[in-house]
Amino acid sequence: MSSSVWQERRHGEDKQRRNDHRSPFQRDRARILHSAAFRRLQAKTQVLGVGMNDFYRTRLTHSLEVSQIGTGIAAQLSRKYPEHKPLLGSMSLLESLCLAHDIGHPPFGHGGEVALNYMMRHHGGFEGNGQTFRILSKLEPYTEAFGMNLCRRTMLGILKYPAPQSLLFVPGSHPEITNHRQLKPSQWPPVKGIFDDDSDIFDWVLEPLSVADRARFTSVQPSLQPNYPHLRTQFKSFDCSIMELADDIAYAVHDLEDAIVMGIVTASQWQQDVAPTLKHSGDPWIRQELADIGTKLFSHEHHLRKDAIGTLVNGFVTAIIINDDPAFEEPLLRFNASLEPEFANALNVLKQLVFKYVIRKPEIQMLEYKGQQIVMGLFEAFASDPERLLPLNTQERWRTSELQGQNSHRVLADYISGMTDEFAGRLYQQLFSPKAGSNVELSKEM
């Protein structure tokens, strides 16, 4: 497939700016970097709640680190596989994907995502990656109705789960609850796919693919995870596979660093949960470096800990390979990046360590639960009387959606998911707390 078709934008542009010689993907990167949706990541939860400590990462700093790791992966693959240099393409493309990958995630992390998914259960559901696709293609006001109007290849790369939610949803898999406070995230996992409301854009992105490629790329299968009852997609594009690896490495390594600095993960937990598994690794580098990395990670010397973090990131980045799936015709689908098996296992061990001692920590879960309640309370209030409570511009979007017979509840999810943690908490107080006073915050549209 010609590269030009992947550089096309959904809405043609005739902007001719003086002496502007940027590539299409450099323009995409600039649009993402300068967007309000990207700026709001500075006040959205990554793992540890915003306001707990000045050191830890927010979704903004996480996204910047994912971008750096993503371009590092591309540089390594370019040297390791020179024959794939044309496929790797622009560093600006990978930066765009990595910077944008979390833009759709709502306030309060997973708690906010589960809450919105529950409130949208009869209206197409909610999932952060699907919302990212929606923001980039429809909501961010770079254009009147086409969002950031990014290149087709950029939109293909952001598609982590290339299938509509209606194809993935398994009915009857969620227990109904009688009170919002009874909502358990494990019982309401979001369906990982594109919202059916955005199927027109999804179709446009996949337009260049052959019938066979599209059918295979969007195929689904039962999930192997016991707590995920819905069907799952099986494939992603080459660019997306690099972005996802960068995200996983940043999550496992950098979020672990935050937890170590704050004393949430200890050296004894490392020795108990990580060392016994990795010392038997089939890769000699992992076996040889393990003890030294463990010592430095928990050192009181800041530079030693940073050296260990750098060693871990470098170890994972240099262990990435390119796989070939000849069943696909399109090179962007035929080739995918992945970790060598021993390093994939090591990364999973680190991710499980973060999940066990950080994500599942009661104090973190209390913050997540609180966020759930805030998001559900806001949604319920706005849904009860949209033309009374929504900001004027959002009211107009809601009315337009109603008049056109579209999913007006999606407008409510768009508004709430765009909020920062602090803004959502403040708005909740103004709506429901008698002590909040009568000075309701008047702010510009989210």
Swiss-Prot record:
CDD domains: HDc. Gene3D superfamilies: Hypothetical protein af1432. InterPro entries: dGTPase, dGTPase-like, dNTPase_2, HD/PDEase_dom, HD_domain, PHydrolase_assoc_dom. SUPFAM superfamilies: HD-domain/PDEase-like (SSF109604). The keyword Glycoprotein does not apply. Pfam families: HD, HD_assoc. Keywords: Hydrolase. GO terms for biological process: dGTP catabolic process. It comes from the Bacteria. Residues 7-28 have a biased composition (Basic and acidic residues). The keyword Thylakoid does not apply. GO terms for molecular function: dGTPase activity. Residues 1-28 are annotated as: Disordered. Residues 59-252 form the HD domain. NCBIfam families: antiphage_dGTPase, dGTP_triPase, PRK05318.1. Belongs to the dGTPase family. Type 2 subfamily. This is Deoxyguanosinetriphosphate triphosphohydrolase-like protein. It comes from Shewanella sp. (strain MR-4).
